[in-house]
Amino acid sequence: MTLQLTNEWDKVFEKSDKVNHKKVSFKNHFGIEIAADLYIPKERNDKLPAIAITGPYGAVKEQSSGLYAQTLAERGFLALAFDPSFTGESGGGTRYMTSPDLNVEDFQAAIDYLSNLDEADSNKLAIIGICGWGGMALQTACLETRIKAVISSTMYDMTRIAGNGYFDADNNKGARKNARKAINNQRTEDYKNGEYKLAGGVVDPVPDDAPEFLQDYHAYYKTPRGYHKRSLNSNGGWTIQTNGSLANTRILTYANEIDMPVLIIHGEKAHSRYNSETAFDMITGETKTNGVTPEPYTGVYPLGNTKVGNKELYIVEGASHVDLYDNLDKIPFRKIETFLKTNFEV
């Protein structure tokens, strides 16, 4: 199937006059065509260090990942923001499905593409995952040997959230069995109806007593600030039954074997902070979190940078989860740039 790619600028952020932009596509090894935006600095002399970026989970490349890509291109990198399989402008017959194996493959397919791109230095490749894709970026780093560095920003471990609930509140056999029953009953209904029911995107209108992080999601996905017509979170959301794949799989089994430089970024005030701090423990062999996730979670690591070997955790003072989607005063691009250039030896 030929992708129908939009040529006009339809991002939720302004176009930079320092960067050239073009639409591209490539296939993953499942044969799904992936749509992407390629951002290249206008002023360049040689092959460039290159970064593949995607996320947040349920967003599209016209939102946060595109902003990251364009901003990093302004700082001298070639950056590729892509729509994962079954979402946005990318292919895939069943829309709005996800699975950890497929998520990792999309990242690896992006590396396939960049490894063969004339403008890119194939010896200086990295990946960045935002929100739920932060966890998938770390999972990719467990397998991918062609990249020199990996960054997660405002990370979720979607398999943990799907299997245990927020703050691990449903981390018990009974709760998981009830969730499995609901998902499998939905599969029966979907087959009977001939279509996959969607879970719904961000709640609109958001109740006054909703948790602050839900209000933050609404402020991004449901207002002109971040709304996009192809974004799952801005509209109908994922299919309900796709949660089964997430809940039945656990990423980061081999996190302690990641031997490349890692930068995990999270906001001090983010409800999701425990995902990053636990992941940092897993890849460094630390035990500070001890798997405990009280609500609200206030964190066990200090503000700023914590470095253990070649792994770094960077807690952004005062930042919420959604601040790291598009708040240029909170996203630590200088830290990201320095981390990448140091590890690319630029």
Predicted regions located by residue number:
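N-terminal cap/lid segment of alpha/beta-hydrolase-fold proteins
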Residues: 3-46
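Short beta-strand element of the alpha/beta-hydrolase
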Residues: 47-56
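The serine-hydrolase catalytic nucleophile loop
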Residues: 58-70, 84
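Conserved alpha/beta-hydrolase
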Residues: 71-91
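Alpha/beta-hydrolase active-site loop
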Residues: 97-118
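Alpha/beta-hydrolase-fold enzymes
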Residues: 138-223
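Short beta-strand/loop motif that positions the catalytic acidic residue
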Residues: 258, 264-266
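Catalytic histidine-centered segment of alpha/beta-hydrolase-like enzymes
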Residues: 319-329
